[in-house]
Amino acid sequence: YMEEVKQVSINGGGNLAQRWGTTRIGSGGLDIALLAAGGAIASVKAVLDRKVDNAYALIRPPGHHAEPEEAMGFCVFSNAALGGMYALSEGGLDRIAFLDWHVHHGNGTQAVVWEDPRALTVSIHQENNFPPGSGGIEEIGAKDGTGTAINIPLPPDPLVGFTTSLEIFSIT
């Protein structure tokens, strides 16, 4: 996959996601995607090194749709998952959790840690949206990671979805 991204980037850009056709990069796109992934990792590192109390990585391209071997939904690399895996491998953490609250399912983050018992993913998203067929409550992880994926698909009605989101977070 990395070689594909590299070649498309070197050859002037183009489409990476053949399955959904939603991820294009331009010439030099690999460098930009690597900067975004590095930004996510640097944010995690800053928190682990206690340089900051918390961090928000405002990066493009985003990452929650990119799967281990496939770009998707404008995402080249699964940046949050890369940051989380950095925390596990270099930060001395035993467990991590990802909260993905977005209209689309966080399929890429979920796919990266699908079998990892150290990583919990919670995705709150609109049901039957993007990617098609993804994010059902039956998706719970696999092997040692069974039970570590929690999907909360909300109805497509914006008012119902918003109200339900507030109830999930107990925000009044």
Segment roles from a protein language model:
Residues 1-172:
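HDAC/HDAC-like amidohydrolase catalytic core signature
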